[in-house]
């Protein structure tokens, strides 16, 4: 009897199409298309005045791509001159979203700028401008497709297939991770 009840419970819980609420730090049509399905509610935190009211609903948070992160967020005054547009409101919002997701163990994804913000919010730093700080033969801001190979330092088979030591990455960035937090 116990096994029968357990199987019914598992079967019933697997059949539920529970709605999941995903909070985007700043929405765009591409993110909405990527996430859109019948079981997902997408909330754009950037357009909501009281973000505390939506944080309690979050099943996941996505920090999206966008403007440069203010170098003052990682104590860098030198790179202020080479940064593009800085959105102070967004920097503050994404730190709040990161802290909430981290403290509450809510799944968190960072895309482009979002991944950089995750690094900064964890205590890391960024290259404010990759070409001027480390030099590169890769043109990061040309028109068209911008991809190049990078060499992997950690070739963990948990993330990449065995034997993988290089991967292709998007290069439409002039900022990148510099120091990773411990």
Spell out what each predicted region is.
Residues 1, 13-111, 119-127, 131-168, ...:
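N-terminal beta1-alpha1 cap of cysteine-dependent amidohydrolase-like domains
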């Amino acid at each position: 009897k116990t096994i029968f009840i357990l199987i019914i419970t598992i079967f019933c819980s697997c059949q539920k199409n529970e709605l999941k609420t995903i909070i985007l730090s700043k929405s765009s049509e591409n993110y909405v298309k990527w996430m859109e399905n019948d079981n997902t509610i997408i909330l754009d935190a950037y357009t909501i005045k009281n973000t505390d009211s939506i944080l309690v609903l979050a099943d996941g948070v996505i920090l999206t791509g966008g403007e440069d992160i203010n170098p003052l967020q990682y104590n860098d005054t030198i790179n202020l001159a080479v940064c593009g547009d800085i959105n102070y409101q967004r920097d503050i919002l994404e730190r709040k979203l990161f802290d909430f997701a981290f403290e509450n163990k809510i799944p968190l994804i960072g895309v482009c700028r979002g991944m950089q913000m995750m690094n900064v919010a964890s205590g890391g730093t960024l290259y404010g401008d990759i070409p001027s700080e480390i030099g590169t033969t890769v043109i990061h801001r040309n028109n068209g497709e911008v991809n190049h190979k990078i060499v992997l330092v950690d070739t963990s088979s948990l993330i990449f297939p065995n034997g993988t030591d290089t991967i292709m990455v998007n290069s439409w960035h002039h900022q990148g991770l510099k120091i990773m937090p411990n």
